[in-house]
Amino acid sequence: CYLSERLMLDARENLKLLDRMNRLSPHSCLQDRKDFGLPQEMVEGDQLQKDQAFPVLYEMLQQSFNLFYTEHSSAAWDTTLLEQLCTGLQQQLDHLDTCRGQVMGEEDSELGNMDPIVTVKKYFEGIYDLLQEKGYSDCAWEIVRVEMMRALTVSTTLQKRLTKMGGDLNSP
């Protein structure tokens, strides 16, 4: 299973959509800013092995989709842009799903306990916590939008890294 250029194009389009969703000046929301502990070094360094990189990428995209595909999110954003973003994230997940069974196979049940996956889940828990603490305010969503741009940039970096690893997710 090979990662396609389509996956990278979808990723870039999703980043553009997030940028267009900007409704407030991020500077007006600095008081709500929080370090969510984006595990960037995990992606950019050599901490992830090839067999871990795919599940981490999948988890980041799935969690991103889940975050924006909610009732609270629908109330916060322009519906058209939000739908386009969710569609783009779903397209990325669908593409990865074609590889998922081949790559993960029987190990799938163990991946939920894999340290990098747990790190990604904790990262998104922090994002949900901020939204709840701030009552899903416009500023909270703006902080989340900016943070998700960082997260999707990291996901894109991980996709590039997987491609450099050969793109064939079945090879050792």
Swiss-Prot record:
GO terms for molecular function: cytokine activity; cytokine receptor binding; hormone activity. CDD domains: IFab (cd00095). It is found in: Secreted. SMART domains: IFabd. GO terms for cellular component: extracellular space. Pfam families: Interferon. Keywords: Antiviral defense, Cytokine, Disulfide bond, Hormone, Pregnancy, Secreted. Disulfide bonds join C1-C99, C29-C139. The keyword Hydrolase does not apply. Constitutively and exclusively expressed in the mononuclear cells of the extraembryonic trophectoderm. GO terms for biological process: defense response to virus; female pregnancy. Its main location: secreted. Paracrine hormone primarily responsible for maternal recognition of pregnancy. Interacts with endometrial receptors, probably type I interferon receptors, and blocks estrogen receptor expression, preventing the estrogen-induced increase in oxytocin receptor expression in the endometrium. This results in the suppression of the pulsatile endometrial release of the luteolytic hormone prostaglandin F2-alpha, hindering the regression of the corpus luteum (luteolysis) and therefore a return to ovarian cyclicity. Belongs to the alpha/beta interferon family. IFN-alphaII subfamily. IFN-tau genes are intronless. They evolved from IFN-omega genes in the ruminantia suborder and have continued to duplicate independently in different lineages of the ruminantia. They code for proteins very similar in sequence but with different biological potency and pattern of expression. PANTHER family: INTERFERON OMEGA-1 (PTHR11691:SF37), TYPE I INTERFERON (PTHR11691). This is Interferon tau-3. It comes from Ovis aries.
